Amino acid sequence: VFSHYGPYEFMMKDENAKRMGIPVPLFNLVYHDCFILPWPMDKKQEDYMLYALLNGGISYVVRNAPYDNVDGNFGSDGLSIEDRITRANIVLDFYQRIKNEEMVEHKIINDHVQQATFSNNITIEINTKENTYTIL
């Protein structure tokens, strides 16, 4: 199944709006191996690419909302099209490694660090404070 997209609730609001809880990949723990879900790739204070990786999803190169200031469209993050393609390829390369695998485990290490492990023993760790990821 291919979907338009299914971002976390906070991705649809201004990045400075108050968040509810810690976003975790519960949906993808169940459906990752049978559902293709593109993710927003905005990079402002926080890098949304990290959530595409954590969820084992694919990326949008450019995602335009129908109107300004709605549906996650709160101005440009300043990335060039070349940077967007480079970032999309990072997500695509990871997706190629885990696309047919179940997500078998998710861990919250602390408020900013999470891990997801797939059935081929590939683990992705994201750090939303440092805006980094590691493939373990």
Language-model segments: residues:
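Active-site-proximal substrate-binding groove within the catalytic cores of carbohydrate-active enzymes
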Residues: 1-136
